[in-house]
Each structure stands twice: as C-alpha cells, then as structure tokens.
Amino acid sequence: MVQLAKVPILGNDIIHVGYNIHDHLVETIIKHCPSSTYVICNDTNLSKVPYYQQLVLEFKASLPEGSRLLTYVVKPGETSKSRETKAQLEDYLLVEGCTRDTVMIAIGGGVIGDMIGFVASTFMRGVRVVQVPTSLLAMVDSSIGGKTAIDTPLGKNFIGAFWQPKFVLVDIKWLETLAKREFINGMAEVIKTACIWNADEFTRLESNASLFLNVVNGAKNVKVTNQLTNEIDEISNTDIEAMLDHTYKLVLESIKVKAEVVSSDERESSLRNLLNFGHSIGHAYEAILTPQALHGECVSIGMVKEAELSRYFGILSPTQVARLSKILVAYGLPVSPDEKWFKELTLHKKTPLDILLKKMSIDKKNEGSKKKVVILESIGKCYGDSAQFVSDEDLRFILTDETLVYPFKDIPADQQKVVIPPGSKSISNRALIIAALGEGQCKIKNLLHSDDTKHMLTAVHELKGATISWEDNGETVVVEGHGGSTLSACADPLYLGNAGTASRFLTSLAALVNSTPSQKYIVLTGNARMQQRPIAPLVDSLRANGTKIEYLNNEGSLPIKVYTDSVFKGGRIELAATVSSQYVSSILMCAPYAEEPVTLALVGGKPISKLYVDMTIKMMEKFGINVETSTTEPYTYYIPKGHYINPSEYVIESDASSATYPLAFAAMTGTTVTVPNIGFESLQGDARFARDVLKPMGCKITQTATSTTVSGPPVGTLKPLKHVDMEPMTDAFLTACVVAAISHDSDPNSANTTTIEGIANQRVKECNRILAMATELAKFGVKTTELPDGIQVHGLNSIKDLKVPSDSSGPVGVCTYDDHRVAMSFSLLAGMVNSQNERDEVANPVRILERHCTGKTWPGWWDVLHSELGAKLDGAEPLECTSKKNSKKSVVIIGMRAAGKTTISKWCASALGYKLVDLDELFEQQHNNQSVKQFVVENGWEKFREEETRIFKEVIQNYGDDGYVFSTGGGIVESAESRKALKDFASSGGYVLHLHRDIEETIVFLQSDPSRPAYVEEIREVWNRREEWYKECSNFSFFAPHCSAEAEFQALRRSFSKYIATITGVREIEIPSGRSAFVCLTFDDLTEQTENLTPICYGCEAVEVRVDHLANYSADFVSKQLSILRKATDSIPIIFTVRTKKQGGNFPDEEFKTLRELYDIALKNGVEFLDLELTLPTDIQYEVINKRGNTKIIGSHHDFQGLYSWDDAEWENRFNQALTLDVDVVKFVGTAVNFEDNLRLEHFRDTHKNKPLIAVNMTSKGSISRVLNNVLTPVTSDLLPNSAAPGQLTVAQINKMYTSMGGIEPKELFVVGKPIGHSRSPILHNTGYEILGLPHKFDKFETESAQLVKEKLLDGNKNFGGAAVTIPLKLDIMQYMDELTDAAKVIGAVNTVIPLGNKKFKGDNTDWLGIRNALINNGVPEYVGHTAGLVIGAGGTSRAALYALHSLGCKKIFIINRTTSKLKPLIESLPSEFNIIGIESTKSIEEIKEHVGVAVSCVPADKPLDDELLSKLERFLVKGAHAAFAPTLLEAAYKPSVTPVMTISQDKYQWHVVPGSQMLVHQGVAQFEKWTGFKAPFKAIFDAVTKE
C-alpha cells in the first residue's frame, strides 16, 4: 500500500493524497473544519458508487453533537454547471437554514468542483469548501488552485471566482469506478505537467504506459447494491491495485507541479499560464468538437501542435516532439484530429482553420488581439516564464496539412547556413535490426525519429527482440539485444504504415521468430499504398528456404502471414534484386542466425542500388559479422553463422538523401549550405549528389571525409546536366529534377535538357515517383520526357517562366502522393516561382498538399526551411481537390442475372443525369463484338473473369468520379480482385448498389432465357455462393420485385428514382419544422396490406416500420417489406425501428449481431430515418452514426415502467448522450402516471430546444402530450390491428383535440372566379379537412370582381384562410398581393392566395406543381436533363407548363401553337435560361436531333386540332421513341376526360397520357398543403374529385 502524502500549496499542507483514505477524509474535515452544517454535493452518477455510500454513512456516524449532514445531488454533465443549478442549490441552502459556518464538500469531477466551489465563494459572502475530486482530471487539475466557475450560453467558465479550498482530499480509490475513456482523458493533464516541469516523471510515465493501458482496458462493468437505496446499480470497475504505485505517483507528481506553480502565481499573472501548455490550441479544437471530444483528448492534440510550433521556431528538437507524440499515443490519446478512430469518435466533424483561429482569439492568456501560446524548450522545461506571442501566420502553418510557400525573395546572396539533417533512415533501420539481434547493450545516437523508425521500434518491442529504453532526454536509444533468442510471435498484426524499409527488413526477421503456445504466426501489414508495393522476390526466396509465408490480400504485397513454426534453413539462397536492394539487405542481416551458413546469390540481372548492399555489409562488420564477397560468382555473398556483438555506442550518420534538399536550396538560391556530418567517406550513395550532380550544374563544392558544402551560382545561372546515371543514389533524383527545372544553357538552340537514368526502381516507391515528378513539374510549366529507366527534364529559359500551379478555376495544389521526397523536392521549386519578380510586386504563393508526409524521414524539414534557411511559409484551409471539386461519384450496379440491372441502370442514369455504360456491352466492343457467351465457350470462365476485372478496374479508374452508371455482369463478384475493386470504390465514396429480387422469380426467368451463357451449376447454388459477396461488396441495396402490370412498373420506377436521389444526396431528407406526424405500423407482414398502406399514412410526413414486429428478420424479407412500403405509399419517408424488449418492443435485448445486420440493411436501403436506442452498446451506436450517410438518426429512449419523472436526471443524461452522438432528432417517451407528468414534460420540452425533440407520454393520461408535441408525433390509424404504444391517437383525433384547445383556428377558404358552379375545389379541400380532422371549411365565392374579393374576403373576413383563384381573376388579383412567389412572377398569374397575417397576402401559382407532380406520378423522372420538352399551345396555362418542364431539368423546350405569331412575345417574356424554341414551320422539326420525351397540351380540348398544328405535333410525337423513359403527355384540360391530343398520342404513337384531372388534383393538393401545413390524403381526394 502507498503512504498518505501531503502537498503544500500557498504555504499550507492542505492537499492530501492517498489510497482508501475515507477514515482520514472524515476525520480531517470534522477536526479541522468544525461546523453546524456539512453539505455533501455530488451528481447522481456518484450516488451509485459503493465507496461514496460508505463515506456518507461514515460521515453521518462521525458527526459531533450539534452538527448535521445534508446531501445535495445534481444532474451529471456540463449542463449542470449553470446559473440555474447554482441558484437551485443556493435556494436549498437557504431553505435548510445554512449559515456562514457551513462547510461545502464537493465530491465529484471538474463540473462539481467548479460549481460547488463557486457557490461556496458567493453564499453568505463566502463559506468554506473542501474538494474531494473523484476523476483523474479533477485530482490533478481542476480541484487545485482555487479556480471556480459556471458556464454561460456564450462560453465556458466565463463567470467565477478564485476561492481556495480548505482541503483537497485526493483518494486514488475513486478511480476504480472511473470510466476507461475518462481515465485516459485525465492522463493528458498528467503528461502535460510532467512535460512542462518534471523530465524525470515524464521518463517514468513513458516506461509505465503499457501497464496503464492494459489495466484500464481491462475495466469491467459490475452490478452493485446501493447501500442507501437498496437498488441494483451498474458501475465500471478498474483494478487500480494492479497499478497502484504508478497511479499514486502520477497523481502525486502532477499535483506537486500544479501546487508549486499556483503557489508562485495564484492569480495567473504569468507563471501559472505555463499550465496552459496545449490548451491554447486544444481549447480551440474542443470548442468545435465538443461534446464528442473530451477536454483531455483535445489538449493532447493541442500539446502536439504547440510542440510542433516550438520546433518550427527552432527551439524544441524533433526528438522531443517525437517523444511527446509517442507517450500520448501510448496512453491512448489522440495526437491529430485526423486519426481514424478519433474522427469516428467526433463523427467526422470538420475543424476549419478560420474557426480554430477565431476560437483561439478568446483566450485569457492573450493580450488584446495578440495570441499567446506556451512554448516548450525541452521535455520538462518551458521557454521563458510565461506564454509567448505567436502570429496567425505561424499558427496557420501548424494547424493545417497544406502549406503555402512564398517566393524566396528576402534571402541574402551571402547567406551561409549549417544544416544537420536527421539520422539516415537506411542506417537507422539497419542499426535497430542488427542491435536487436545482437548481444549486449548498444547506445544508438542520432537515430532518425520518424514514422518509419517508430514502426520498426514498435515491431522490435512487440516481437520481444530487445529491451528498448532512452537516455539524454530521449536523444539516445538504448537497445539491449538478446541475441535473437527471445524473438516471439505476437497476436496483433504489426502495422507498418507506408514504411517500405521496415516491411522488408521485418519479413526476414519474421523467419527467425519463435512460436508461443498460443501464437504460431505473425502478420505484417501496412496502409493502402504499402499493400501495393512489391515484396514478392524476397518472399519467394524465403519460401524456397523453408519459411512458410502466405499473402492475405494482393499476391506479391503486404499483408503477409509468416508462420513461426517453420525455420530459416540457410544454405544457398537465390534472390532477384533488380527491384530493391532492401531485399538483399534483409536476408544479409538475418543470415548469421540461419541453421546453416548462407550463400546469397543475386540473380536475374544487375542488382539495383548496390551501394546500399555495401552499406549493410559494412554495418554488419561493425557488429562482428564479416561478409565475404565471392570472387568466382558475380553478385554472390558468403555469410557465416554467428551472433552480432553490440558495440557500446553507435552513431548514425545523417541521411544523405535528406541532405540533398538543403544543398539543392543553396544551389537554387545562390547561397551557401554546409552539412557537417556527411562527406566522401559516407556509407550512403546519396553523399555523392553534390559532387556528381550539383557541381557539373555550376555549383562550388567543398567536400571532406565528413562534411559537404555547396555554394550556388548567381540565381538563374545553373546549367542542365546532359546525362547522369543516378543508380547509386536513386532517391536523390527528385531533388535533381527540381534543380534541372530552372537550369538552362546560354546556347539558344539548346533544349535545356537534363537526362537522368538508372532510376527504374523509383516507380515502385511510396508512389510512382517518375510519373509524379512529370505530372507535378508540368503544373509549373516544366516539360519532361519519361524514359524506360529515367526522366528528361526540359529546363525553362528563365526562372520568371515558372508558373504558379493553377487551372481554369484558380490555383491548385502540388500533390505529394503521401511521399516525403516529392514534398521536400517541390518545397524548393515552389519558392523559386516569382522569386525574381520586382520586390513590391504581389506574388501568389505555391500550395503544397499533405506536408506532414515529410515526417517519414525529416519531420522538421519545414522548420529548417523556415527558421534556418529563411523561407516564408503559411498555412491554408485545404482546397477542394480539383478532382473532387466537380466530382460526381459514379454508380456501380451489381446483382444476379435477371435482377433488373439493365432496366434499373437506365432509370438510374436518367434520374441522376448520368451516362450509362453496360460492362457486358463494353466487353463485346473490346472483343470485336464477340458475345460474352461465345467468349466463354472459346476461352472459359476464368479468362472471362480476368477480362471482366480488367475492364471494371479501368472504367472505375478513368470514370469513377465523372457521373456514370455502370451495369455489371452478375458474376463480377466471383473474382477476388473484382471484389476488392468494388469494396475500394465503395470505401472511396462511390456507390455500389446491389440490386436483388426474390430468388424464386429469378430462377424461373433464367431457366427460360436462351441468350445468356448457361450456368454450369444450379442457379440456387450460384446465389448461395454469391449472396454474401454481393453484401460485402455493396454499400447500398435495392429490392426490385417482379412487376406484372404497367402501374406497378411505374410505381417501382418512382420508388427507385426517389431512392437513388436520396442515397446520392440529390434529394435532401428534411426534418419537418412544423407540426407533423409519423404513423407506426404494427403488421408482421406488409404483403397483404398494400391497399391499406396509403390511407394509413394520410396526414403523415413519415411511416415507421416496426421491424421487431415483422414475421422474420432475414435480409430478403426485411428488404422486401421496405420495397412494398415504398411502392404502396409513393416513397413516403421511412422510419426504421427495431425496438428492443427492455425499451417496450419485441426484439431480444442481447441479439446484437442480428441488430447490427438489420441496421446495415436499413442504411443500405437508404431509409430516411433510423431509430437508434440510446440504451444500446456504444460501439453499435457509433458504428451506425458513422455509417449513416444521408439517413437521419432518431436517438430514442422509452420509459415503459414509468420509473422516471420528467425532472429526473435520467432524461437530462439521455439528452446529453443524444447531443454527444449528434443524432438528428431526439425521441423521448415517458409514462404519464398523473396529469402533472404532462406539465413536467412541457417544461422539459421548453428547456431543450437545441435539437428537434419528439417528447410524449404514454397512457390515456398522456394524450395531451401527443397533442402538444410539435415534430413527428407518433400516431396510429383505425386501419391498424393495434397501436404501437398505449395512448396513441390518430392524426384526426390529435387535430380535433388541438382545435378544441385553441391550437388550430377554424378557417374559411374559397374558390373565387366566374363561372365556378362546377368547380371541384370545395370537394377536393373539404375531403382532406374531414379525413385529417381539420376544422376548416372550403366554399365558393362567385364573382368577376377582384375588388369584391378584396373587400369581402381579404379585408372583410377575419377567418379568411386562403383562396383558389380561377378565371377571370388570376391577373386582376395580383394587384392586391403584398408578395409574389417566383412561380407567380414568372408565370404571370396567381391561382393561390396565402394569408401572411396582419392583412398581408402572398400570391402563388400551383398550376406548375400540378403539371410537374402529375408527370412525376406517372413515371417521368424528377430530372429529365437528357430529354427535351414540348408545350402545345401558347395560352395562359402554357406559361405554367414551360415553368414545370424547366423545373424537371429539360435543357430545351419546344413550343408549337396554331397562331405562330404569339410564340415570340411569349418566349421573350420568360427567362432565357428556359431555352424555349418556338417552332414556326413543319420543316424545321425534321432538323431537331433531341429526343422529346415529355409534353404538355394546353390547347382547348373541346374542338379538333388545326391541321398545321396537328402535323407539327405528330412530327414531335415520333421523337418520343428513343426517350430514356416512356414518353409522356399531360393534358391540361380536365374536361372531357379524353381529348383529341390524348387520343392521337396514345393510340397512334404509343405515348403514355395523363388526363387533366390529375393536374387539377395535384395543383389543388399543393394548395391544400401550403394553406394547412399538412400532407394531403391524395388518393382519397383524387377519388372524391373524379368519382363523377
């Protein structure tokens, strides 16, 4: 056990730290703070902790006579830290008669400590307070120093006071019940205090990180009996005693630092703001990412950013930054907002640069507008005694991954700099492998601290190859080698990022690893690019030598599985080394540990980069193994058996490849740079770059055995290099390229060409570097020629010819391809652009993307370029990549034959305005029109699959972002390579849509189709095999049932068009803002309910599918139910709900696997809303939230048992949880035990308005809550077998009750005009009012006078609710409108008057909506961009028709009329973007190339067509044959029901015709919805209007 420690602060030993010190806590408070009243304050979460209960009971038992103990419990969470809670507590204290001798005892985390401390500072002008912190963060930070505060709506901690506690009693035992994430969160402050003040403690923290994380990750939830209430509570439990010493020390040491700083600067005038290290930037991130991200997580990111800022200023060494980053990761904290797990946790929120800087401007350390940041000098020490001023320019650079490089204008020609690059990556990685295999201790100095070596160190540690520690404040790594004897297989895959060197070296090392009882193999893996880079030659050699290795994905690349029960035999090993010398070095280094001496023969041609092989051999010699080169056989080496003996110290030479950048800077800017630790004796081939490349180009070179100095010629006088073989220094070719770009001859006939060869291996590095250089140099205006093993760079005649990379839309970035060498090379060329312009001339900077990729070999490169070499840099908000700016992600449709892919692909292309490509047809085009069937007969299925995969990968690469629909063959998923390509496309944001239907229907169809190649097996077997593949490859799914009638076919098309528009974001899912409802279905199968589904949904904005009520949960069954519902209800938005038993439903509580599958079905089916229970496991919740796409999430919580009143903390906690999850809608359902529960609910509703909230009470006593709920009220229907919850009402019942309460005012509405005796408007609207229970009345007001309408209705009827305007008043009424909609203005007529209140009216026109919606309802897509439109007639209705066709996306609209002279004035009166073409002659129609697929007839219907007009019409009707959908004509007249135009269109030209009655009803329904705000019961209205 640990000892009780007392830490002084402000001269008093008031901070007590120990473990299990409840006795001491009670005794200290009662003895040293005598009082008549003690008040323990905590939140409801702490009340569940047994240790708290024990403490309260003990405190009560120990009270002296005359004293009392009060307890006050608040709701948990930051929302309790408010003025309201403070006032409630103060009122409680007053009511209880508390006086000035009261002692407040704050037991809890930071929220409790801050708020109770503030109450104590103001109550009775100040009473005593004792802090008992229970979270790690509170123990080491908020409880110490006397800062107290509450939050306001405008910001956190804005109102508070300094009020020092009488005691801070820190009991480590509280941490046993701290949640894992909160525990890790607190470590950020612990690491921070060590970082700024205590280097020894920082080192101790480093060495105990794995212990900490193992214990914290082992926390379990346990059920406990509450000693105060006897209820069963569930709490987290961590085995603190397993790391008690470490935890005690980390808490104590962190407290000591804060106490010392506070004692020196209580009121935070200078020194105390050092405690804000990481907070300036961290708080800015927290302001954006709250509540998803915790304080410590944001401070962790802030510390790394602020440390990088210090490194940027040249103050902090790169090693120290690497140490800080490493320890934060080791304790489970984020170091970047872009980490995958952290992005998922914060729900992919963006952190815009301007917002971060704005948030940073609100910081107490700032002075006015000047920002201040704490700068670190080294681990354990800050720079100066307080925060330092920092410019926005420097902050922008640090906060972004895109850097702006300004012209190198202000760099003096006589500048001389000394630059020491980081240690060589090549030597660092070799040294770590050899020292780990060696025996004894080796201190490695100048090790490169980069991503590559970090992965290598991690791997050596995980494989137990050596014991690794650090000295010299982390600058020296100490490797205690075990001679290879302890190498053991690890269970987790070794992730190597994009570290090619590490991956190759570790592949051979893996052959030496021993199995453990539980682990017989290891897995090496990496990022996406690493999984493309070659490793096959090395694997082939090791396999041939007895090591069993499997590829887990792509043949020839990582990931690989190396079996550790096989052995590395030795003997003769043959290896192809023409691609990478690292294969050779990998085997060389491990060869001494083979069972036999090794003869390594390099075969297949001249090995690449032989100098690196020589480097390896020389290093092995330093560690005691001598490699002999064969004198009889070329490229062959003899390696004896043996063990490396580690030298006591090994100093790693600086990286010669990295050294080329500062040396090239000198060459290009005419300055001088010295690299003091690389000379001609270097082991590295790139050391000759200065001598062999820069010297012939005109530079002065001074090179000794250990140093290199380059002085560049005057700017602009570098000479091209006619030819250079860079095979000995291939990595340096990129640097040579950018130097060559500004090199030119004085000879006017010269092409200024520099030719570089010997670099073929650079095509398979981090990227294809040769292609990358050619592509990016072109952006600067520099031409190149790619060679088989090199590149030619055609230098510019003048540096002034260099261009800022840009395209037609403006500047673009230089892509770095996640390649450190590409980034560093172009950072030099970027600074030369405009560098020779006049000094006062404004010069645009060059943008470099992904600057952090330099972390692979030189994390501090940008710091050197800025601080040492004098470059001006800035940061910038990322541009939308040019490729993404206009990106229209393509759609790939997969599925079995006969699933409807061909038809639905056409619908998809039409709906989205995309181009359609059938891959089977493309296959035939590429194979001389040979059919798939013929090709399979001649070449077999395997060859066909290869070709199919090739074609698919090509089209995705070339057109994946360009708006295509690709219809694939049914068997595309048979190929593993195709499956990977499909999944990759889906993960990159593409749409892979699995189209499926009932397998029985598919079988029947396929057995009767002779045009397709025969299956070699039963269709059902094929489906059984492919079903899972289709699911895993697709990110969306659509069930397309067989259609037996045209009406079904049209309904399916509408359903699909809305579906594809929803999943692609073309159709936005809107959450209703006004009164709205959704109906809860309770059927177990919708198949037999299709007729009822439409009336069931009357008046509703959405329909809930209670999946837990369905007959079964199979994917096919559930998808079919969704399809039936969409077709039957014309795609009313679906709420997908799986209600668990404990939340009042039927779904088993613990069936999480099935639940996940159901949610996956929902999201793939693009449901508009998904109900997510807030009681589900967190991992399921985050999985759904991060995969939601365009689906809106309803976070729900139900209290069926009536356990919680609406003022209980449960609801507040759940609401905060919903905010943290960032759900779109919150749904809370309580149980009304009495009427007052409804009043409490309304108070809750009124105080929780920051998210749309559905809040209702169940039972008949809660009915009023359903009436008062505003958004998406759950309702039932008389047509349902039962309601989904007790007390549910129908829409009509709710409206009637709401009317009786004064919520809906009865309105009088009219149709106005003359004659209106036969008007169907009253029947239309009154039918809707009756069905929905609305109190309104619609009547006729017959008049020819607009003036009379104004006097009697607009001005004279106080209950006036709106008017439908017909002839002759559509123009006359406009003068009395205060506003006109765009439609009314353009159409030039008003058919709808909408009251705005205060005697103001808006004029609208819904005729165009009647036309548009009638067309869409009859199979016309919502977007018809590839089809022209036609309007027949030029009267008043034609204007609405033209407006409607334009809204559908018709790029061109033709218009014909009996009197052609009327066309021109009509066209001129409408917007030019309508692109209306008036047709004057029949002949001109023949020249029209467009397909015409949609038409509106606006001519009188009661007489025959004029012959000339009929002739024009018929010529247009012919053009409907090739439309992308069934050509459709709408008749605007509704009497007679069949007109001459309809007859000729349908009977002679097979156009689909829509009668005028549909337009009439659709325009009336649009009016209904505008006047009432309710969704109209369309079918019932249509039947009523048309029943005559």
From Swiss-Prot:
Xref: InterPro entries: 3-dehydroquinate_DH_AS, Aldolase_TIM, Aminoacid_DH-like_N_sf, DHQ_synth_AroB, DHQS/DOIS_N, DHQS_C, DHquinase_I, Enolpyruvate_Tfrase_dom
Described function: The AROM polypeptide catalyzes 5 consecutive enzymatic reactions in prechorismate polyaromatic amino acid biosynthesis.
Subunit structure: Homodimer.
Any one Gene Ontology cellular component term annotated for this protein: cytoplasm
Annotated PROSITE patterns: DEHYDROQUINASE_I, EPSP_SYNTHASE_1, EPSP_SYNTHASE_2, SHIKIMATE_KINASE
Enzyme Commission identifier(s): 4.2.3.4, 2.5.1.19, 2.7.1.71, 4.2.1.10
Highest taxon of source: Eukaryota
GO biological process, one term: amino acid biosynthetic process
Keywords recorded for this protein, A-Z: Amino-acid biosynthesis, Aromatic amino acid biosynthesis, ATP-binding, Cytoplasm, Kinase, Lyase, Metal-binding, Multifunctional enzyme, NADP, Nucleotide-binding, Oxidoreductase, Transferase, Zinc
Homology family: In the N-terminal section; belongs to the sugar phosphate cyclases superfamily. Dehydroquinate synthase family. In the 2nd section; belongs to the EPSP synthase family.
Residue span of region Shikimate kinase: 890-1080
Binding-site list for NAD(+): 43-45, 78-81, 109-111, 114, 134-135, 156, 174-177, 185
Binding site for ATP: G895, M896, R897, A898, A899, G900, K901, T902
Catalytic residues, chain numbering: E268 (proton acceptor), H283 (proton acceptor), C853 (for epsp synthase activity), H1198 (proton acceptor), K1227 (schiff-base intermediate with substrate)
UniProt key word Transport: no
Reactions it catalyzes: 7-phospho-2-dehydro-3-deoxy-D-arabino-heptonate = 3-dehydroquinate + phosphate; 3-dehydroquinate = 3-dehydroshikimate + H2O; shikimate + NADP(+) = 3-dehydroshikimate + NADPH + H(+); shikimate + ATP = 3-phosphoshikimate + ADP + H(+)
Family annotation (HAMAP family): EPSP_synth, Pentafunct_AroM, Shikimate_kinase
Cofactor binding summary note: Binds 2 Zn(2+) ions per subunit.
Binding residues for 7-phospho-2-dehydro-3-deoxy-D-arabino-heptonate: 125, 141, 147, 157, 189-192, 258, 272-276, 279, 295, 364
Annotated region described as EPSP synthase, given as residue ranges: 405-871
Region spans: 3-dehydroquinase: 1081-1293
Protein name in the entry: Pentafunctional AROM polypeptide
Organism: Saccharomyces cerevisiae (strain JAY291) (Baker's yeast)
Oxidoreductase keyword on record: yes
Region (3-dehydroquinate synthase): 1-392
Primary location: cytoplasm
